[in-house]
Amino acid sequence: MADLRQFLTEHRESVWELPGDVALVHELTALQHLLDERHQYPILHAKQVRNLAGDRSDVSIVTNLTASRELTARALGIPDHRRTAQWFASRTQAGIAPSIVTREHAPVQQLVTRGEQASLFELPVLTQHELEPGPYLTAAHATTFDPDSGIDNTAIQRCWVKSARQMTWFPYPASHNARNLRKFHARGEGCPVAFWIGHHPAVLLGTQAKLKYPESHWDAAGGVLGAPLRLVPSVLHGERIMVPADAEIVIEGWARPGAVSPDGPFGEYTGYLGGEVTAPLVEIECITRRRDAIYHDYASGLTDMLVPDNMAMEGKLYSLVKAVAPALVNVHVPTEGRRFHAYLQFKNPGPGEVRDALLAAMAYRRVKTVIAVEEDVDLFSPDAMLWALATRVLWSRDVITVEGLSGSSLDPVLPEGVSTTAKVGIDATRTPGYPVVATVPDEVRRKVADWLSGGDSTRWPTI
């Protein structure tokens, strides 16, 4: 069955088992910053760590799991990482219903602690960046349900561990989990919630599918996984909240009405520290885990966190844009643009089709800049995209700017409390009669490529 440890075993050549003790404060995140700067993306596995209580931990840490786009695509069974958009769109829409297992067949419930014995301090939770107030769960999938329909929702949302049995939880105000939370509180009831941590990357990406409200992520996760996702009733909330049976850790509790606490500042996907906010305070009543659990951490604001969500965005944007622009062939959301840039690629678009597509993509909340190119431009090459912008855009003719569209409250350019923004669409496709691109014959390229393979290039300048 697919789980985190199966993936680590299958890709052991990409896993760096870190030697020696690793501190929970800053060290792993600092290493990930350095690796990002070098464009190197090994999975990091730290086994010699202490928990938040300061004791030697029997729970190890895995991070940088999805920093490599190529490796993440292979986890989905996609041989070419440049072909994820259409694949992701079709697999999440098709979906595969989950299967239900009992506790005896759920590794995540091998160890169960409840009440006073359920301590977050038993986990090796990291403090990532300077000025952050403490240790944060960054790969916890918060799972709630709509009290009206009973339909569940799961999403990655940060949690600041404040004590052994309390943590803040920040559901983005426009998120489906936040809607569920508000519904429970409007009834005067506590919101039941479970946070699951650690699974196969295919499951992680499937649960980041962009769906309507209310709509369960479990079918989408099964679609991406290519098999039914195994679920088990949570210990505290029973069948009202199901959790992945093959996860590593589950934290269960309640977000009571009026129970709030300061949260932040926190390093966001933008690369900047978000300010302090008021967030729900969760009372922890149960923790379940595997006997040799692996704690999964996402490096916030680095490729490790950007790659999987950007892939999910590519699938959603492909579906949105393809509906109005049949000539669309590919979509890319580059990590260099965080989640604010989207690139669209076309084959023989008709009159007005590119502009229709630009406007459709601009309607997606996170996206601020959309660039359209043709098939001869490599979406995944920053050099090629800059070349297209420099040589195929007449700025007075090829740019669409729209004010007052929905944006992200995490966008650092927006004043506090403002949720709308200006967006731009750029048509970098060629007009009729455009000059021919200067090229060399393919057979000559292949011939001289053989010369390169026989030379020692280790000392050649690279910049």
Named regions from a protein language model:
Residues 1-281, 285-463:
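Extended, highly charged
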